[in-house]
Amino acid sequence: MAIASKLLDLYEMTIKETFECLELKQLESVAKILNEAKIVDIYTHAHNLNVAENFQDKMFTIGKKVVCPHDFYNQRLNVLASDHTHVAIILSYSGKASWILPILKKLNEKGVKVIQIGKVGSNYYPQYVNYFIDVSDNEHVRNRLSQFSSHISMQYIMDVLYGSIYNIERIHNSKYIYESIDYMDDRHF
């Protein structure tokens, strides 16, 4: 129970700190941009792919296309195929991954709006990032048991974004799910 209790405390503190980082007007602007995008591309790696694919799944349920290329080669191909109708999300807790800058530069050349999500103080390329969403900086990247804090803060932000996007066209999205659920979910009740 000690581990469960410590994780509960960590999760509560991380979500609270991430909530306190949120800027309402920025969140509304980001949700609007994502809602209007023809395609949302998420660039990330390692454990953050789980968060990206969870967001992708939720967006698919309301008819929004999200692409999560898994490796550096496919990320670069996806960047090359992007245009101004795409919006890119960069998920990187530290903001220091070597793949970020080349992708940001090319997205900028292609006229793609960029939203980066990372720990407080990790926007190292503000000239290429349209919106930066801060998450709790409660994790030490080199001194940790696992990515508990960064994972829960990233998941929380992506869930907040999905909920905000859903709410923009709530009636339409509810209708889409209602009319599509039998095809999406083939379980029989």
Regions found by a protein language model. Name each.
Residues 1-25:
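HTH-adjacent hinge/linker in prokaryotic transcriptional regulators
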